[in-house]
Amino acid sequence: MQLNSNEISKLIKRRIAQFDITCEIRNEGTITAVGDGVIHIHGLTNVMQGEMIALPSDQFAVALNLERDSVGAVVMGSYLNLSEGMVAKCTGNILRVPVGTALLGRVVNALGVPVDNKGVIQCSCYFPVEAVAPSVIDRKSIDEPIQTGYKSVDSMIPIGRGQRELIIGDRQTGKSALAIDAIINQRYSGVKCIYVAVGQKATTVANVVKKLEEHRALSNTIVVIASASESAVLQYLAPYSGCAMGEYFRDLGEDALIVYDDLSKQAIAYRQISLLLRRPPGREAYPGDIFYLHSRLLERASRVSSDYVERCTHGKITGRTGSLTAIPIVETQAGDVSSFIPTNVISITDGQIFLESHLFNSGIRPAVNPGISVSRVGGSAQTNIMKVLSGGIRTALAQYRELAAFSQFASELDDVTRKQLQHGQKVTELLKQKQYAPMAVSCQSIILFAAVHGYLEDVEVSKISDFESALILYMTYTEKELIKIIDHDGVYNIDIENKFKSILETFKSNQSW
């Protein structure tokens, strides 16, 4: 058989023309060191801060240290199956978590993966865990209250929608209880809630979830958990993940409330990560950017303008403002609020509620110290009726504390001083409240009215609690229409004042308590 060179040439040219070489450019590196959840990768280029890095066995790491010739990253999950020499690849993606209404009523980890055995969460929307806070132009002034249901907080330390209000105190002083009751009080208000548990025992969080379910508040709440048994990176990321979930509702023109319980443990987790990444330690061995850790998180809580909401929804929602209210919790040691993390967070937030051990142990619960607790938003975040009636409460308590200090050294007291001391004791007793029993504005209002207008003068201190319970019960059954008006409008006028006087006079004439 004779071969034709022309045919062979044509065949080769046709095969060359049909030959398809696909080029795949990958940014790969080699793991050079593994230990304590931290890996160092050599050879990666153009890596972003916070970028997801793909590892063998479908694992991921987050790039935190960008050095000249290597990348330091923290592994999300177990690092025990990783070893030197393995390949790591850039993904080009920043860490994102699922957001949306499908998460309400669920318990998820720091990555948005459900851990409550209720099935997979179907989410079509994902938000980055790190986001830029709304600018000054995009924000709106805070003028709407978020009711906690506590008389002492709503009257003296009001919290507004879009505010950052710190709860600070020693362990076992009722910090979490106050925040959880604030969530329970939102069950009928339409405010979406996110509870972020960082570094807590899983059994403690399970009890919180159970209580939220019992009080019909879980269906309106997302619980994000990074328990004490989980890695430091998940404890560090959990508050940012919860914040992203809250921003979804804020950007839709809705109101959301997020509780960070607590940021002290997040700071400890971040310190652990930073030391493992060989970052230079500073005060109390915390890294130099520990302030930025909390400031960039808490600055994302805000009340945004209707223009911002319209821009975020591409014109689908107009004329509505959104808000994300943050209640961070910080634990102190022996009441020392001048240590590093407490002073940082105090300087970032718009006020703080101090809870004190000696008040808690003496039976005053919530153990709020009204002298050093403050809300920088103040009366602009209160309803009209609470603003009018609460002024006398703070004054009465301030006078009581001052006189109580001097009365210890005085052998005899005049009648005026004795009356002021008795009034202060009654107001202190009146502000006590049981856990899981948040109170509506209407009920708080008539109790404060009774205290301010002298209706407690003939009531003994030991009978204050019974007087309060009986008064609320009486008002609930006899004045349903008035309760609706006050809870809806929050106005205070001469008609409501006369109505309150009539209710109290009729109630006291019955002596039903």
Curated annotation (Swiss-Prot):
It catalyses: ATP + H2O + 4 H(+)(in) = ADP + phosphate + 5 H(+)(out). ATP binds at G169, D170, R171, Q172, T173, G174, K175, S176. The keyword Transport applies. InterPro entries: ATP_synth_asu-like_sf, ATP_synth_asu_C, ATP_synth_asu_C_sf, ATP_synth_F1_a_nt-bd_dom, ATP_synth_F1_asu, ATPase_a/bsu_AS, ATPase_F1/V1/A1_a/bsu_N, ATPase_F1/V1/A1_a/bsu_N_sf. The record marks S373 as: Required for activity. GO terms for cellular component: plasma membrane; proton-transporting ATP synthase complex. Its EC number is 7.1.2.2. It is found in: Cell inner membrane. Belongs to the ATPase alpha/beta chains family. This is ATP synthase subunit alpha. It comes from Blochmanniella pennsylvanica (strain BPEN). The lineage of its organism: Bacteria, Pseudomonadati, Pseudomonadota, Gammaproteobacteria, Enterobacterales. The gene is atpA.
